Amino acid sequence: MAVYAVTGGAGFLGRYIVKLLISADDVQEIRVIDIVEDPQPITSKVKVINYIQCDINDFDKVREALDGVNLIIHTAALVDVFGKYTDNEIMKVNYYGTQTILAACVDLGIKYLIYTSSMEAIGPNKHGDPFIGHEHTLYDISPGHVYAKSKRMAEQLVMKANNSVIMNGAKLYTCCLRPTGIYGEGDKLTKVFYEQCKQHGNIMYRTVDDNAVHSRVYVGNAAWMHVLAAKYIQYPGSKIKGNAYFCYDYSPSCSYDMFNLLLMKPLGIEQGSRIPRWMLKMYACKNDMKRILFRKPSLLNNYTLKISNTTFEVRTNNAELDFNYSPIFDVDVAFKRTRKWLEESE
């Protein structure tokens, strides 16, 4: 029976991973490691779940928290393209924090690491080039924001660490998973968009080109892919060692506006008029200045305007081929759960 650690386990994705691990037969203990205290800690009658408050940049505390762990699912990150955090803060957590986790793996002899990367480790790039493809599709990877850069650098770090020698001459095996835009109950961004629509009289004003298609994935399916990868990476001859995979399911691929409308229309949200691009650009520039001068974050800035209007569509089944992944939640269930959460959070 194994001991698993989930860094960022109090977060949106991390919490769902912890929930699914409760049903994993080979897991005896789950250590939930996060810098914040979970206001609603998950409990279980069949698994030992220990919550440990810890900064992943503090090596000594990380080492103490991970002592005795067999496998790490490393989800901890600052996910920010809105200007809430400084570039240094984002890089410190996402890149240097991952360095700390890898150093602990080497020092403690932890043999398996599943890393939550991001689609932004690949794109959309700073040129606004569309991406339609899979894990092996050629694409100009040129991050346009420090968040994307930090996830790219951390992914490369984790991939390079695969098959490296750790304590007692054992080997470390790693795998990276790249969620596309995650949605579901607990998604703060979806909640913000819903609240904005309510404030505008149940109208969703359109800000995104209808042709800018984006792949999405339900949080429960992204979490399941992590749990499944954690199982398969321990098999001798496993194909996933040293590889990266996009997280996907059968959620609609469409523009952000159209996706939100599909999700929220049963809640009474109606499609509104399109805001002119010149006006969006003007507000984006204004918000960028506020961020620079006053550190005021904003959903609309030049970076978010560009990436939301740039196609990033994943077409792959590599996770199915290499570790037998298939979604465990269909789209109807995912949408119903998300809608229920939105209604209850009003």
Curated annotation (Swiss-Prot):
Q: Which reaction does it catalyse?
A: a 3beta-hydroxy-Delta(5)-steroid + NAD(+) = a 3-oxo-Delta(5)-steroid + NADH + H(+); a 3-oxo-Delta(5)-steroid = a 3-oxo-Delta(4)-steroid
UniProt keyword list: Early protein, Host-virus interaction, Isomerase, Multifunctional enzyme, NAD, Oxidoreductase, Steroidogenesis, Viral immunoevasion
Q: Where is the active site?
A: 147 (proton acceptor)
> What EC numbers are recorded for this enzyme?
1.1.1.145, 5.3.3.1
Gene it is expressed from: OPG174
Name of the protein in question: 3 beta-hydroxysteroid dehydrogenase/Delta 5-->4-isomerase
Instruction: Kindly summarize what the UniProt induction comment says about this protein's expression.
Output: Expressed in the early phase of the viral replicative cycle.
Which pathway does the protein contribute to?
Answer: Lipid metabolism; steroid biosynthesis
UniProt similarity note: Belongs to the 3-beta-HSD family.
Keyword Zinc-finger among record annotations: no
The UniProt annotation places NAD(+) binding at: 151
Q: Does the keyword Isomerase apply?
A: yes
Superkingdom of origin organism? Viruses
Task: List the InterPro entries.
Answer: 3Beta_OHSteriod_DH/Estase (IPR002225), Lipid_A_modif_metabolic_enz (IPR050177), NAD(P)-bd_dom_sf (IPR036291)
GO terms, biological process: steroid biosynthetic process
Pfam families named among the record's database cross-references:
3Beta_HSD
The job of this chain, per UniProt, is described as: Catalyzes the oxidative conversion of Delta(5)-ene-3-beta-hydroxy steroid, and the oxidative conversion of ketosteroids. The 3-beta-HSD enzymatic system plays a crucial role in the biosynthesis of all classes of hormonal steroids. During viral infection, steroid production contributes to virulence by inhibiting the host inflammatory response.
Named from the GO MF annotations, one term is: steroid Delta-isomerase activity
